[in-house]
Amino acid sequence: MMKTTIMFMLVVVISLTYSSEEQEVARTYCGAHLANTLADLCFGVEKRSGAQYAPYFWTRQYLGSRGKRGVVDECCFRPCTLDVLLSYCG
């Protein structure tokens, strides 16, 4: 009985630790902290060529509200994840 309880507790602790490592925390990034984080994340990310950009009329039609906001709106005025910051690279 005691071994089963210990084993169960061990499994619970390991699963909680593993799941918390996978969750990405949303944070606010402003000013120099935002600039430095973007520089670190985007270092080595290749810039997109002009051919990879969609035509202007297509982007305006399908970007929706995100096309009107910038990285400061998304990551300084409210928390964002590193994945959102990475979307601004290139």
Curated annotation (Swiss-Prot):
This is Bombyxin B-3. GO terms for molecular function: growth factor activity; hormone activity. It comes from the Eukaryota. Silk worm has two kinds of PTTH: 4K-PTTH and 22K-PTTH; there are many forms of 4K-PTTH. Residues 1-20 form the signal peptide. Residues 49-67 form a propeptide. The keyword Disulfide bond applies. The gene is BBXB3. Keywords: Cleavage on pair of basic residues, Disulfide bond, Hormone, Secreted, Signal. Disulfide bonds join C30-C76, C42-C89, C75-C80. Belongs to the insulin family. GO terms for cellular component: extracellular space. Gene3D superfamilies: Insulin-like. PROSITE patterns: INSULIN (PS00262). Heterodimer of a B chain and an A chain linked by two disulfide bonds. The keyword Secreted applies. Brain peptide responsible for activation of prothoracic glands to produce ecdysone in insects. It comes from Bombyx mori. It is found in: Secreted.
